[in-house]
UniProtKB/Swiss-Prot annotation:
Interacts with WAK17 isoform 1; the interaction is direct. The gene is BAK6. Glycans are attached at residues 66, 104, 113, 150, 161, 215. InterPro entries: LRR_dom_sf, LRR_N_plant-typ, LRR_R13L4/SHOC2-like. It comes from Zea mays. It comes from the Eukaryota. Gene3D superfamilies: Ribonuclease Inhibitor. LRR repeats lie at residues 90-114, 116-138, 139-161, 162-186, 188-210, 213-237. GO terms for cellular component: external side of plasma membrane. Contributes to activation of the hypersensitive response, a form of programmed cell death, upon fungal infection. May sense the presence of fungal material and relay the signal to WAK17 isoform 1. This is Disease resistance protein BAK6.
Amino acid sequence: MAAVQFAAAGVLTGLLALATLASCNTDGDILYKQRLAWEDPNNVLQSWDPTLANPCTWFHVTCNLNNSVIRVDLGKAGISGPLLPDLGALESLQYMELFGNSLNGSIPSTLGNLTDLISLDLWDNLLTGPIPTTLGSISTLRYLRLYENNLTGPIPPSFGNLTSLLELKLHRNSLSGSIPASLGNIKSLQFLKLNENMLTGTVPLEVLSLVVVGNLTELNIARNNLDGTVRSSGLRVTAVIQDMRIA
């Protein structure tokens, strides 16, 4: 009986090892496919070799102890091209740092599947189209920075579900519609920058109340098409409201 149990334990250990290896290879396959979709004039992705056992030895990639990818650091790397929907299958990814490049096309809705994601930095690119509502399902997200792109459409009300968020920076896009009152649910929010868009309507009281009941220290909604009245006496917030009537 002991021998049978020992053999069973060995089989289980082997299966777990194979599962971990398969996961690593999956991450590598995804990233290599993304590499092929990008232009890389500076050869920063030269080390992304699909023949290796896993991507953990690649430059600009960080893995956890299980050899799963948790971080991709390609800020200001000179790359261009689209973001593939396959990126949403990087199950352990915590940091996606792709700012300051020439990425184009839309933000894949599949990024909402990255349930461990802490930071999504896609600022200063050439991204177009709407912001996926699915990003509002990433409860672990603390930094969402999509500013200085060409994004259009509304701010997803689903962002009100991001109750761990510290920074929401969507400025210098072409976003339209109203500011969702649901953003007032994010009591952890410290920085909210929505300036230089095409937002309309009034600033919801739920959002303004974050100054009192939350941790908001910077609110920038300048250079939109907002209207209404804002009163801010004794508030801790730096409110830059150039295009609003202030009573």
